[in-house]
A protein has these predicted regions:
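Active-site lining segments that contact anionic ligands and/or coordinate catalytic metals
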Residues: 313, 343-345, 372, 399-401, ...
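Helical hairpin unit composed of two closely spaced alpha helices linked by a short loop
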Residues: 342, 352-374, 378, 383
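Short, glycine-rich nucleotide/cofactor-binding loops
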Residues: 161-166, 349-356
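A general structural signal for well-ordered alpha-helical packing
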Residues: 332, 339, 360, 373, ...
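A general structural motif
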Residues: 137, 323-333, 354-358, 385-386, ...
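N-terminal localization/anchoring segments of enzymes in phospholipid and broader phosphate metabolism
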Residues: 1-333, 337, 341, 365, ...
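C-terminal structural cap/anchor segments
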Residues: 383-414
Length: 414
């Protein structure tokens, strides 16, 4: 036996480098093959394959952690109800006369854009909506809290950041009061966004009786492979009838009248009408994914009644975008279509301007066609590295005739 053991040890010492090399080679081939077959962006595929082969073993590990989108396969099982909502919204679709009056004749550029976006998103255009812009937390938070206080059936709230500060606590109190009234309440916070406050407000919500969940908390080991897949959606839907969405997180810094330590300028929207059903459906899918609970029943039915009758309503369509989309390039197609349809002007406002080549080229082509293209960026940014990267890209649009404007402080997250 000692002789056999010694022989096995000697055999292993002799062969382990070859076995390890073969294993790394197989993993490298598998990872690079996956990247080539799955990645739809050619540059992304080339970059991942380069990393995988130039850093054997380590590159494949990094690709497995950050390069594989696991959300799509899980979320695809939760989309059946989205088709049902789209069917229900067909009754709220504008007729031909309404489209002619608002968007133009069938040959008009905006009509072709409407058709394009419908085909890309597979979500119908809804009529008879009311959309009200709300500037910052000073305008938006009181209206949102009033909507929560008036809820009679359900409240769905999703936010990337939900700080444990005076504003956050005010929302907790309003949500807790709704629970005590018998309202169905669900709150979804991103796993990384929740960590902006320490300790997280999650425990305070749960102590107040509010059903809350984190979207892919990175503190849980099994969710580590999802670390780069975040939920930045900001959604509030009350009774399936009144919705809010935009750029506002829930944090005291968005209340500029309070002179916060880290002020943030932002814009939010109050939405009434059939399109609110699309907002609610996105939340229901996100909640089912994160909390493993399917929200159903009368409390979670969308109210498809018109918010505005006649010709004063707004045509609207909710376009979802995120790592759970089966076609991650759909937003690029929508933007490219919009820029191609532009006749007079294009106004772009974003806190983080990092467009890919396709969007840059579409902006440049629009400017060279004589369209006025204005890009508004924050004068100061909360992410220094992103600001540097954004500034380094501006020459690509400036030299083709686009105009770039910088807003004064505070940081503009609009």
């Amino acid at each position: 036996m000692p002789l056999i053991a010694a022989t096995l040890v000697e055999w292993w010492l002799h062969l382990w480098p070859h076995i390890t090399a073969a294993a790394i080679l197989l993993v490298t081939i598998a990872a690079s093959t996956h990247a080539i077959l799955v990645k739809r962006d050619t540059r992304s595929a080339i970059a991942w394959v380069g990393l995988i082969w130039l850093s054997p073993g380590f590159g494949a590990f990094v690709y497995w952690i950050f390069g594989v989108n696991r959300i799509q396969s899980r979320a695809s099982q939760l989309k059946a109800d989205a088709v049902k909502v789209s069917r229900e919204l067909t009754g709220a679709a504008p007729n031909e006369a309404r489209l002619n009056a608002v968007i133009g004749a069938p040959e008009a550029p905006l009509r072709s854009l409407e058709s394009l976006v419908g085909r890309i998103t597979r979500r119908p255009l809804a009529d008879h909506n009311r959309v009200t812009p709300l500037t910052g937390g000073d305008e938006a938070y009181p209206v949102m809290l009033e909507a929560i206080a008036s809820a009679t059936r359900s409240i769905a709230l999703s936010s990337y950041i939900f700080d444990r500060d005076p504003t956050g606590k005010q929302f907790v109190e309003a949500l807790s009061a709704a629970v005590r009234r018998g309202i169905e309440v669900r709150v979804l916070i991103d796993g990384i966004g929740a960590s902006y406050s320490f300790p997280s407000i999650l425990r305070q919500l749960e102590s107040a009786g509010v059903r809350a969940s984190l979207f892919l908390p990175t503190s849980v080991p099994i969710y580590f492979p999802y670390a780069n897949l975040r939920n930045h959606r900001k959604i509030l839907v009350v009774d399936g009838r009144v919705g809010f969405t935009g750029g506002l997180n829930i944090r005291h810094g968005c209340r500029l009248s309070e002179n916060p330590r880290h002020p943030v300028r932002d814009l939010h929207f109050r939405i009434e009408g059939p399109v609110t059903a699309q907002l609610l459906q996105v939340f229901i899918e996100d909640w089912a994914f994160a909390a493993d609970e399917k929200l159903a029943g009368p409390a979670w039915d969308a109210d498809l009644s018109a918010a505005v009758d006649g010709e004063e309503g707004v045509l609207a369509r909710g376009i979802r975008y995120g790592p759970d989309d089966p076609d991650i390039g759909r937003i690029r197609l929508v933007l490219a279509g919009a820029l191609a349809a532009a006749q007079r002007s294009v106004r772009v406002m974003t806190p983080y301007f990092l467009p890919d080549d396709a969007v840059c080229q579409a902006l440049d082509v629009a400017a060279m066609r004589g369209v006025e293209v204005d890009i508004v960026l924050p004068g100061e940014n909360n992410l220094t590295m992103v600001n540097w990267a954004s500034t380094a890209m501006l020459w690509q649009v400036l030299e083709r005739g686009c105009r770039v404007w910088k807003t004064p402080p505070p940081f503009d997250h609009t």
